[in-house]
């Protein structure tokens, strides 16, 4: 069955909920138990991820809202929930007192004593929430690949702390841009483009860029961090992000089937590849409709794909159902 992954994108905004070490300790409330566990937050924050539990019942319900379950009708399995961990996230977390930070991360990621977040999304190189714009190979030549200070000083320490709390966390990664020396203005105009925003990947560098992915996954592995999955490009139809790169479905198909997929296979990487990674509406570009579906229809590309990633910033989430029905 073809998986569909819904990517949660954004900075880790629940940092606003972190505690201060000077606050008085709050009494530990008993954990409610029941058939269903409910976490609820209200606009007024009278409930702030408050945990409750309810039991199934076949009796008439006097409550204003009822949820009726039909066990004979099943849909896709929900693998988990999570958040983006960016350079800015990690920088701010490291400003906290170590005990406060650990308590906060435990509350967020622990299966036993927290909310049990099970996924993390990080960037390969910089993102729109990084401390600076960079890739891991800013000097021309793939032999110059190296993890950068933002990763070594901020992202890796926080990921290691999270993994010490919940070792089963799955990490999904995506680049916002390739190294600038691999960029061109467009595929029609192969003029080099030395700006972080927009541009396209020069096909002449497909193999080097695939090697870049391999080296990045291996570098994190050397730090004890497994990368569960990658996408070839964050928001491939977005020309205007702080760091961005346009990648049509044809480009992504060709990159995956001729470079990224084979390089992962040769390197023996278990890291999965998800297609697309953008909005439900495909930015209203007619030629990009059904972006991942068109990639699935190419057998040479689809053999390397696990599924597709979507963002919730545009269009209708019904597109997930459409894709699942068309490409089960």
Write out the residue ranges for each language-model feature.
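Sec-dependent bacterial lipoprotein signal peptides
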Residues: 1-16
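Bacterial Sec-dependent N-terminal signal peptides
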Residues: 13-33
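Solvent-exposed loop/turn segments at secondary-structure junctions
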Residues: 87-91, 125-129, 176-181, 233-239, ...
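Active-site neighborhood of glycoside hydrolase catalytic domains
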Residues: 207-229, 236-328
């Amino acid at each position: 069955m073809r998986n569909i992954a819904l990517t949660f994108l954004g900075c880790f905004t629940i940092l606003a909920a972190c505690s201060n070490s000077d606050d008085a300790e709050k009494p530990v409330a008993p954990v409610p138990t029941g058939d269903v566990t409910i976490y609820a937050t209200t606009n007024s924050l009278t409930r702030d991820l408050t945990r409750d539990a309810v039991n199934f019942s076949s009796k008439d319900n006097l409550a204003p809202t009822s949820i009726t379950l039909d066990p004979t009708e099943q849909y896709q399995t929900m693998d988990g929930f999570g958040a983006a961990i960016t350079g800015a996230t990690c920088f701010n977390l490291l400003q906290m007192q170590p005990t406060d930070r650990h308590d906060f991360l435990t509350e967020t990621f622990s299966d036993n004593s927290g909310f049990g977040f099970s996924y993390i999304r990080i960037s390969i190189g910089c993102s729109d929430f990084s401390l600076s714009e960079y890739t891991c190979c800013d000097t021309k030549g793939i032999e110059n690949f190296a993890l950068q200070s933002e990763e070594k000083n901020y992202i890796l320490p926080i990921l290691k702390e999270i993994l010490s709390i919940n070792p089963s966390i799955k990490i999904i990664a995506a680049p916002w841009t390739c190294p600038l020396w691999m960029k061109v203005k467009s595929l029609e105009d192969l003029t080099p483009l030395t700006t972080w925003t927009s541009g396209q990947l020069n096909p002449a560098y497909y193999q080097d860029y695939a090697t870049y992915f391999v080296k990045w996954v291996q570098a994190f592995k050397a730090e004890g961090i497994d990368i569960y999955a990658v996408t070839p490009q964050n928001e491939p139809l977005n020309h205007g992000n702080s760091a961005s790169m346009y990648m049509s479905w044809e480009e992504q198909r060709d990159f995956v089937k001729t470079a990224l997929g084979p390089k992962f296979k040769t390197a023996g990487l278990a890291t999965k590849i998800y297609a697309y990674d953008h909005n439900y509406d495909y930015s209203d570009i007619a030629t990009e409709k059904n972006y991942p579906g068109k990639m699935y229809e190419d057998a040479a590309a689809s053999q390397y794909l696990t599924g597709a990633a979507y963002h919730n910033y545009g269009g209708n989430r019904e597109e997930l159902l459409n894709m699942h029905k068309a490409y089960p």
